From Swiss-Prot:
The keyword Cytoplasm applies. Required for the first step of histidine biosynthesis. May allow the feedback regulation of ATP phosphoribosyltransferase activity by histidine. The gene is hisZ. This is ATP phosphoribosyltransferase regulatory subunit. Belongs to the class-II aminoacyl-tRNA synthetase family. HisZ subfamily. CDD domains: HisRS-like_core. Keywords: Amino-acid biosynthesis, Cytoplasm, Histidine biosynthesis. SUPFAM superfamilies: Class II aaRS and biotin synthetases (SSF55681). GO terms for cellular component: cytoplasm. The keyword DNA-binding does not apply.
Length: 396
């Protein structure tokens, strides 16, 4: 009988050598890129209080989190989100630092989130956050950083879809409908369920102009210019106009950096987490149906910790990026340093040690063979991807 404990729980996975190496390369390249841009790395604990994620606008669903009780009887969770703990750290430990404050991190997230991580319950997340700036330039710079990060990893066939939560929120705030009805409207727009949305809107007692805009919002996606032209024909109010101007400024900024081909606009995009207050965005590739990155503005989040501080940021899903690189065959040839296998004959240990030291100083990977049979050595070298076998001494 096979013991059940040899199998993995649902939603987690083992990473073998090649995958670990590839993930390490991805994370190293991201951190190198971000440090060059002035971001500073922090790390939050794996365990947090449950209440941190269940208050106000940042509320996460309890059934999406992994909960446990400590020895004192306090309810804890495995970190289900990357942004909230960083916001807590900034508000409680970094108030006196120089702002704008640019933070980056790489850490594991534990959450059942099919949109962002498929069926994975544990996923690796790398992110950046900018605190203390309330401007479209900060949002634009964050999206540019996301694009530069994906390009630095070797991805080219990707698209960043940009949305604006202020538009839909402005419309919903003006409607005399229940919270459940608002939530249903948001869900239907998010899923682009046109027929059901239209049926629901016909039943609700709302202004005809509002009904028209809500019907059209799921259709408003595509190039920035095309979407703006379509919106101009709708009866929008001043709040929506200001939100659209902000979105347009961000798109112009990204285009000025030469990244216009990577962006599109989707006014029907909704935020999966409730703390977003403005611009939001998601990144995809054609080869992979899941999200590679997501982010946006969350100006009210730190108020929960007694600090009034605007913020914006994004997170990359490392494992999804690994898959995208593999599926799209876009990964740059990570040949890495030369890999040599030293084979010692006649007990020439001193010569082997000198040669190994010399090669290591040049940045090579050097392994001293523990095998003696020539055929076994050849098989081992091929399977390990060794570039060259170096023999020290003469074969007997």
């Amino acid at each position: 009988m096979v013991l059940e404990k040899v199998f993995l729980p649902e939603g987690v996975q083992d990473l073998l050598m090649k995958d670990c190496h590839h993930r390490r390369l991805i994370e190293g390249r991201l951190m190198e890129e971000w440090v060059k841009q002035g971001y500073m790395e922090v790390s939050s604990p794996t365990l947090e209080y449950y209440d941190l994620f269940r208050q106000g606008e940042q509320m996460l669903r309890g059934n999406k989190m992994f909960k446990l009780i400590d020895a004192k009887g306090d309810l804890l969770v495995l970190r289900p989100d990357g942004t909230l703990p960083i916001a807590r750290m900034v508000a409680t430990k970094m108030k006196d630092m120089v702002y704008p404050l640019k933070i980056c991190y790489i850490q594991d997230i534990f959450r059942l989130d099919q949109e962002q991580a498929g069926k994975q319950r544990e996923f690796r997340q790398a992110g950046v956050e900018v605190f203390g700036v309330e401007s479209y330039e900060a949002d634009g710079q964050v999206i540019i950083t996301a694009i530069e990060s994906l390009k630095a990893l070797g991805l080219s066939d990707f698209q960043i879809e940009i949305g604006q939560t202020k538009i839909l929120q402005s419309i919903l705030d003006s409607m005399a409908v229940t919270t459940d009805e608002k939530d249903e409207i948001i869900m239907l727009i998010h899923n682009k369920n046109f027929s059901t949305l239209e049926s629901l809107l016909e039943k609700l007692d709302i202004d005809p102009k509002t009904r028209l805009i809500l019907k059209e919002i799921p259709n408003l996606f595509g190039t920035p210019q095309g979407v703006m032209e379509s919106v101009a024909a709708l009866p929008i109010n001043d709040n929506i106009k200001r939100a659209l101007e902000e979105l347009q400024q961000i798109c112009h900024m990204i285009q000025a950096y030469g990244f216009g081909q990577y962006i599109s606009v989707d006014l029907g995009m909704t935020a999966p987490l409730g703390y977003y207050t403005g611009i939001i965005f998601k990144g995809f590739t054609k080869d992979l149906g899941t999200i590679l990155c997501s982010g946006g503005r969350y100006d009210r989040l730190l108020m929960s910790f007694g600090m009034n501080c605007p913020a914006t940021g994004f997170a990359l899903l490392i494992d999804q990026i690994r898959k995208a690189l593999h599926l799209g065959q876009q990964k740059k040839k990570e040949s890495g340093p030369p890999y040599y296998l030293l084979v010692s004959h006649e007990g020439r240990h001193e010569e082997v040690a000198k040669e190994a030291t010399r090669l290591k100083k040049t940045g090579c990977i050097v392994e001293v063979s523990l095998l003696k049979d020539p055929q076994a050595i050849d098989i081992y070298a091929k399977r390990r991807g060794v570039d060259k076998i170096i023999e020290i001494g003469e074969k007997k």
